[in-house]
Amino acid sequence: INVPDLLIASHIIPWADSTAEQRLAPENGICLSALYDKAFDRGLITISPDDYTITLSSALLEYETKDYFDKHFGSIARNKIIMPIEHAPNRDYLAYHKERIFKGV
């Protein structure tokens, strides 16, 4: 999305679960639209710590037949995220999200 007002700096490890250092670490953040921020926070999508690809949860796949699914979620499944020039998302933090927050495949 190219509309800065619709982008959110999202924590990979949630604020409540983070140490003081993690809360301020740029590597504990990713830039997402409001829709994907909510999906990420709720564990409906995750980012692989191995190759930075997006995985959809089975809970989200229940909506695969809905009109909006392909446009908003099917189109991002298995895509690699656009990496920032500096402060790439920390692989350990992404692993935490995948293991503890993501609702699984």
What kind of region is each of these model predictions?
Residues 1:
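Internal active-site segments that recognize and position negatively charged phosphoryl groups
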Residues 4-7, 12-105:
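A detector for short metal-coordination/catalytic motifs
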